[in-house]
Amino acid sequence: VFELGLLNIHCHLIDNLDKVGGQCAELYPEKPIYDIPSRPVVTGQELTDELIKQINPFKPKFHLNQQVDKIDKSEYGWIVETSVGVKIEAKCIIIAAGAGSFVPRKPPIENIDQFENKNVFYAVRNKSMFENKKLLIAGGGDSALDWTNELSKSSNVTLIHRRKEFRAAPDSVGRMQELESQGKVSFLKGTIKNIKRGSENKIVISYQSDENINDIEVDYLLPF
């Protein structure tokens, strides 16, 4: 949107989310980001807010909570129709979909939906709710490692992954391993198999490690 504004091109932005900001706003508004030029650290929401301020002078029009359903050629250029019936005529269409619509990466557990938004969360939108709680973070990518490192500052965090090798950035992996060596993070090699209710609003996670099935009781499960 910003680059189009510099070219004096008025922009309509269509997004399936209910807010502007994509991944930063939807998946990790409170997650510290360290790889933005000139910014030692910035949260996803702070970055989103600053980018919105940057494009405001160009007065883009946002169409949220909808997606493109149909594109037709017209005499003028193109007619785009969204899932709520909005029609936009434009000379050109730019697809900047990133990873596409966000779908939580759910572990293949039959009853996991019973615990969603209670004990199971697929994104961290409010870090304070996890303070002084026992967390199990599942995954081996950047989000899993970054949140393990960040939430360990104020929570009891265990990371579980099916193997000891990770997809995350080497720096994040190194920091997690250092925290583990200091006793600030625990690591389990295994695969989650089942969830059941525990004591005092907690949940019990059953996981398979090699040939063994073990249990761990936690307040929250965060699969990434």
Regions found by a protein language model. Give the residues of each.
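Short amphipathic alpha-helical segments
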Residues: 2-3, 25-26, 105-109, 148-150, ...
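Conserved FAD-binding subdomain of flavin-dependent enzymes
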Residues: 19, 36-63
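Conserved N-terminal glycine-rich FAD pyrophosphate-binding loop of Rossmann-like flavoproteins
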Residues: 17-42, 169-175
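A Rossmann-like FAD-binding core segment of flavoenzymes
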Residues: 52-82, 88-90, 152-224
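Glycine-rich beta-alpha-beta "Rossmann" dinucleotide-binding loop(s) and their flanking helix/strand
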Residues: 84, 93, 97-123, 208-224
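Rossmann-like dinucleotide/flavin-binding elements
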Residues: 1-18, 116-169, 211-214
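N-terminal-biased segments
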Residues: 1-16, 85, 89-106
